[in-house]
């Protein structure tokens, strides 16, 4: 998403934790992300299908070009900050397909192995017609879909205060049920770039974004987290490994 996030990502990868990394390919810093991932081919890489741009003063637009998908962008040519704002603009589904296809093709051209797709802010699967389109594209390109392998999605540490994120992650490990669980994390470093980000979708955005993302990085790379995994006999696997174990044909649309 940004240079600060990429620095945090590299630190997480170098810690040795098996991770799956979802890339915002319309984002300004995606090429740096790709460079990092090329140095670490064991990392499972996904496309964070993106139809929104939510950060004040730090925005992105379509890979396919603003003039190609005019119903997906605001007056300034950027993605709308929320799924609701996009839907109010009555997006042309053909343009949604054009853009998602462009993101997938950019990812495949990048030179890193792409294993799966997931969904920035959930928008690519939030409406029935969007979900059906995303499913069709995943099948066409032979990609896994996050949430389609029976995984339980977890991210309780996101809203915990920076100093409490370690406690939140350990508590999550302690209550995990048998099966596949995805812990959705957002890492970064505590610097001015990341600290300036404000979510436009709420009057009460998560404060001190840089400290929160540094807190997640610190929690994930802490000896305490590693010990909790060992104590509970929790095995970390990537989406690449999950797909290898279950196969793409095992994918099922999640209930609800």
List each model region and its residues.
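Active-site beta-loop-alpha junctions enriched in small/polar residues
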Residues: 24-26, 48-54, 122, 150-153, ...
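Aromatic-lined glycan-binding groove of carbohydrate-active enzymes
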Residues: 134, 142-144, 170-195, 237
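Structural preference for beta-strand elements that scaffold enzyme active sites
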Residues: 18-20, 42-48, 114-118, 144, ...
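Catalytic domains of cell-wall/extracellular-matrix polysaccharide-remodeling enzymes
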Residues: 90-170, 174
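C-terminal domain-boundary segment and adjacent tail
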Residues: 145-148, 202-256
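Acidic (Asp/Glu)-rich catalytic clusters
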Residues: 9-16, 30-44, 61-74, 109, ...
């Amino acid at each position: 998403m940004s240079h600060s996030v990429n620095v945090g990502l590299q630190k997480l990868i170098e810690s040795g934790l098996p991770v799956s990394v979802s890339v915002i390919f319309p984002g300004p810093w995606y090429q740096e992300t790709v460079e990092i991932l090329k140095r670490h081919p064991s990392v499972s890489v996904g496309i964070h299908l993106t139809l929104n741009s939510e950060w004040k003063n730090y925005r992105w637009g379509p890979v396919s070009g603003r003039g190609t998908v005019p119903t997906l962008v605001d007056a300034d040519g950027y993605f709308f900050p929320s799924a609701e704002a996009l839907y109010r603009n009555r997006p042309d589904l053909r343009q949604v397909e054009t853009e998602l296809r462009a993101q997938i093709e950019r990812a495949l051209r990048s030179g890193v192995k792409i294993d799966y797709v997931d969904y920035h802010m959930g928008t690519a699967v939030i409406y029935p017609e969007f979900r059906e389109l995303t499913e069709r594209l995943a099948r066409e390109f032979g990609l896994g879909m996050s949430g389609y392998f029976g995984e339980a999605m977890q991210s309780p540490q996101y809203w915990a205060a920076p100093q409490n994120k370690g406690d939140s992650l350990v508590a999550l490990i302690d209550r995990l049920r048998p099966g596949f669980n995805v812990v959705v994390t957002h890492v970064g470093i505590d610097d001015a770039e990341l600290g300036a980000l404000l979510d436009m979708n709420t009057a009460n955005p998560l404060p001190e974004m840089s400290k929160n993302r540094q807190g997640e990085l610190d929690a994930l790379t802490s000896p305490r987290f590693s010990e909790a995994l060992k104590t509970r006999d929790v095995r970390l696997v990537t989406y690449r490994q999950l797909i290898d174990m279950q196969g793409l044909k095992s994918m099922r649309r999640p209930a609800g």
